[in-house]
Design a protein with these regions (language model features):
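Active-site-proximal alpha-helix that buttresses catalytic centers in soluble enzyme cores
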Residues: 1-300
Length: 300
């Protein structure tokens, strides 16, 4: 019997570098599992859209959607879960995080950035209004504390508190930076380069690490999620339901984003404690939501 098709579903981004990094993750997955049919899909910003990919799968072939996202949120609980339920023989795995191996990647990024034991670390996630997303970031912070002796403060780009700029500001008096002084370092808990990663540079930390990708460990985690969901009686993601929507995280996906909701929610400017929101979010997110509404209620 053939293995189920893997739908490696990312959020989507307008960043060419971020898109290349996510495509590299899919390539790593395929290289680690020769013969596995790995399909590309997105829930926003990029094509092919997850709904279209699912509709185009061979009839009768089982499939597992693996969210290339770092925590639960609107897209995992609603968009992805609905896509899995809407096709016979399909399921959805849990997202990539939290996982101790993500802390290993963050530890490597901090070492690459020259972090020392005297520095404070702001663990910067995208953010979500779903409380489970913040819980998963706190869990990841505990994994990172087990690897490093630094003071580690979780913070968020949007939708949750503290914001990344606020966390940096609160640590600055204690960690002034400069030669011989403890610094404030942002550990980018974001999947790839994109809008939110670029915004981290505006938070006035001394150093910002690179995002999680590229890393082969990410492909190993994705395959573990796939295997758990594909196994008989496997550990699939929870059912869809009324879920809070998230601030638009573009490709980074730590608390993955819903662009349409983000575009209508008031956002603080960076100087008052929140990262700016991407300009591309509103049109793409709106038209995707409108298309789904029309498909559901006015089928051809």
């Amino acid at each position: 019997m053939n293995s189920p098709i893997m739908i490696a579903c990312a959020h989507g981004t307008s960043s060419p570098l971020g898109a290349a990094e996510v495509n590299g993750l899919r390539a790593d997955i395929a290289e680690l599992r020769p013969g596995l049919d790995v399909r590309e899909a997105y829930v926003d910003v990029q094509d092919p859209d997850l709904v279209d990919v699912m509709a185009g799968l061979p009839e009768g072939e089982p499939a597992v959607i693996v969210p290339l996202l770092l925590s639960v949120g609107f897209h995992t609980k609603v968009d992805i879960a609905k896509a899995a339920r809407g096709r016979a023989g399909s399921s959805a795995s849990e997202p990539l995080g939290p996982d101790p191996r993500l802390a290993e990647i963050l530890d490597q990024r901090l070492r690459e950035a020259g972090a020392t034991e005297h520095d404070a670390v702001v663990l910067a996630a995208a953010g979500s209004t779903n409380p489970k997303a913040s819980v998963s970031v706190e869990e990841l912070a505990e994994h990172l504390r087990a690897l490093r002796g630094n003071r580690i403060v979780p913070a968020y780009g949007a939708a949750a508190t503290p914001s990344v700029p606020d966390a940096v500001a609160s640590l600055r008096a204690e960690y002034p930076g400069g030669e011989g002084q403890g610094r404030v370092i942002i550990a980018s808990y974001l999947l790839a380069h994109g809008f939110f990663h670029d915004q981290l540079a505006k938070a006035e930390a001394d150093v910002v690490t690179e995002p999680l990708l590229p890393s082969r460990l990410m492909a190993e985690i994705a395959l573990d999620r796939y295997d758990a969901a594909a196994a008989p009686g496997g550990e699939a993601a929870g059912e869809a339901g009324a879920a809070p929507r998230d601030a638009d995280a573009a490709v980074e996906g730590a608390g993955e984003a819903d662009a349409a909701a983000a575009s209508t929610a008031p956002q603080k400017p960076l100087g008052t404690g929140a990262l700016e929101q991407p300009n591309h979010a509103q049109p793409r997110g709106f038209f995707k939501a409108f298309r789904r509404f029309m498909t559901k209620y006015f089928p051809r």
